[in-house]
């Protein structure tokens, strides 16, 4: 497995992988890998001849009061895990490589990026869209894999790829992979390591409360009071605050007051012990 931090070397190495018609899948990450990331790698390996994983802690998607400096960085450990999974190449650029002096461009995806996490983290999805677009242009993958845990991020990336007429990857080849969960149902996240044992135990109420709310909505309960009950359950369990608990259209993320004959998601962001957790689940049978 190669680990590369120069763009010219990346392009040469990817071209070599493509010799003979081999397909290339990209799995973008910020490192601090866990089983959720490795599941993305395995899905990619099952669909492409070669897997390229990127590791880059992207400063432009962190706000001024967020955890950029504290975000875990463990390149050697991450690379060992990726090599064990058969990854062909790790693209680990420096900040200077991605954003050289004079860098002045940004991609903003309106609409789908503006509510939910976008409302609480202004500029976050501009940073996500910009860095992912750069990664797509750098690697030119045939397909790319993202976790469904960050559902809004996945939606933003798909709209960006559609609107910019990207062909590598085409929007249809941007694949979402089901959220990987701990034994108690909590969605795997690099930020879970910030939780104290007490807060980690309390956090397990999040997926349980979401499933209860989904069951109620699917059985005809009114959406607004059901979501209010969900928020109350989280606060009672020890969460500090709930940023949002929303039923939304799965594609455009517009809030829904009732289930319709199209895919929907329940999306929640809540804070416990200073750590912000997000989760989402499908709602309805469509």
Swiss-Prot record:
Pathway: Cofactor biosynthesis; (R)-pantothenate biosynthesis; (R)-pantothenate from (R)-pantoate and beta-alanine: step 1/1. One of its GO terms (biological process) is pantothenate biosynthetic process. The active site is at residue 37. It is an enzyme of class 6 (ligase). One of its GO terms (cellular component) is cytosol. Disulfide bonds: none annotated. One of its GO terms (molecular function) is ATP binding. It catalyses: (R)-pantoate + beta-alanine + ATP = (R)-pantothenate + AMP + diphosphate + H(+). Homodimer. Catalyzes the condensation of pantoate with beta-alanine in an ATP-dependent reaction via a pantoyl-adenylate intermediate. This is Pantothenate synthetase. The lineage of its organism: Bacteria, Pseudomonadati, Pseudomonadota, Alphaproteobacteria, Sphingomonadales. The gene is panC.
